């Protein structure tokens, strides 16, 4: 009916559960590049990562991104999960890797990773054998900013005068006087 609104569940736990379910991002076949699941970055998404005992899953952050704060990586269950971090590369190409490994199957926890650029929300699930070797992200907003910058640079490099017939220009003249650095060459 026109003007009708969808009512929310009265129980706030059901509202939270529904919001979390809507925010979950599952791995997709098209998202894989070799063994790396590449998720498109979105603020507030809950990225699903599947792990297995005896296997390390690498959560790779963006190049140049750095962990920040006194506890930049926090997990809900730090007893049954082994979580560490390392860095590959150096300088602007340095890349932080969060390494996770469950101690047993059929457990789950969440992981919050705070960096100088964003906060990642990850839900970890342990299976008996199936695991994701590596997870990383693509950053559509960063690509859009870079594209806008490239377009602005191209526009500023474009010729000032468009539509001039170069064949109609007259170069039969002579310039005399001092040789100033701004003096025309033709």
Task: List the model feature ranges, each with a label.
Residues 1-186:
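A general "mature secreted/periplasmic domain" signal
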């Amino acid at each position: 009916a026109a003007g009708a609104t969808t009512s929310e569940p009265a129980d706030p736990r059901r509202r939270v559960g529904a919001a979390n379910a809507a925010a979950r991002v599952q791995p997709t076949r098209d998202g894989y590049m070799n063994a790396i699941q590449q998720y498109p970055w979105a603020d507030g998404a809950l990225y699903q990562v599947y792990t297995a005992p005896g296997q390390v899953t690498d959560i790779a952050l963006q190049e140049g991104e750095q962990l920040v704060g006194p506890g930049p990586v926090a997990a809900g269950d730090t007893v049954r999960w082994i979580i560490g971090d390392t860095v590959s590369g150096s300088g602007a190409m340095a890349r932080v890797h969060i390494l996770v490994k469950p101690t047993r199957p059929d457990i789950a926890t969440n992981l919050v990773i705070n960096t100088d650029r964003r906060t990642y929300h990850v839900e970890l699930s342990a299976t008996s054998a199936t695991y994701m070797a590596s997870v990383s992200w693509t950053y559509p907003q960063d690509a859009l900013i870079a594209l806008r910058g490239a377009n602005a640079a191209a526009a500023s490099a474009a010729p000032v005068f468009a539509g001039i017939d170069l064949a109609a220009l007259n170069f039969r003249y002579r310039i005399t006087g001092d040789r100033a650095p701004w003096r025309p060459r033709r």
